[in-house]
């Protein structure tokens, strides 16, 4: 009986050991952290592409699930409401025009400690783009992409006028005059110019003007040149060219010259595939001047998943994520170690000097800018009064 008991105990011990070994061999299920990611929509192509990029991230980071959703409607209003309710996404788009305001409101997480801890290098970002998201010496986001303006010209009309692509203000006016004289733009104007400071401000920079001294002779002369092209009959606004923006005016043949960003290229390909046009560097005068329209991925100050959010944010803006993002040509890389697809050189050469699109009291100031510019163009409001109004708005 004693032998039987010993045998039973021995078998039991073996069974326990086997169970323990099996339990140890069985991998524990890793904890999965869900990170929310949001931005505005720029069309189905861009939304679908971002989802593909996110899917690639999740495959290489199985412990992080990314819940990507598009915020429809007015993005700024929607995000402001979410900030107030403390339920903003973990990672989200921040337009350069809003970066300073949101950082000062304390709704964006400063990234300095994450950069230091992970030894993340920011050296490959174009400095002018990265600096757009620096406030008080702190980085509040990494630029996910960008676009400056370039000059797009209907090459058929340019050839019919016997002209070459202009490089300077004087040449621009000369080419436009030749187009007008020869009537190559039937039912339209040689140049499309929007009543929008997002198109006129580069001309101020090109003439040595600044927003800090927006009432200077240099700024005044730049505005007079811009508006003067319209007054001389060489240009007009999109609404006068049966268009809602200059891209449509160019594509439909109502204008031969436009000043738009990289976003024009996929639009022309899908909407006006038969229009022959070329993309040339932005016009210049005393100097090169351009705007950098850029958007960051930033982290919510209230995020409950900050480490996982940082992992996503830094990957999306790193070389692997950004290479995937710009692969379709919908945007330009904000990193010098990621190549843009072909045909973008006219945009990329603006990287060293393009200035971030944004300024103090952005929402109110931008409204004043464009309302006054419209009044200057349509009802003869004095340029000096517009610049005085803008100066006051900038100061708050």
How should these model regions be labeled?
Residues 1-36, 59, 336-338, 385-388, ...:
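Short, low-complexity disordered leader/linker segments with a strong preference
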Residues 29-31, 116, 261-274, 283-372, ...:
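C-terminal lobe and pocket-closing loops
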Residues 29-52, 147, 198, 356-362:
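Extracytoplasmic "Venus flytrap"
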Residues 96-150, 173, 274, 279, ...:
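Hinge/lid segment of periplasmic solute-binding proteins
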Residues 176-180, 212-239:
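Glycine-centered hinge/linker elements that transmit conformational signals in sensory
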Residues 40, 58, 199, 224-305:
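Extracytoplasmic/periplasmic substrate-binding proteins
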Residues 52-125, 156-167, 257, 267-271:
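Extracytoplasmic "Venus flytrap"/periplasmic binding protein-like
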Residues 30-43, 64-69, 90-91, 140, ...:
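Short, well-ordered beta-strand elements
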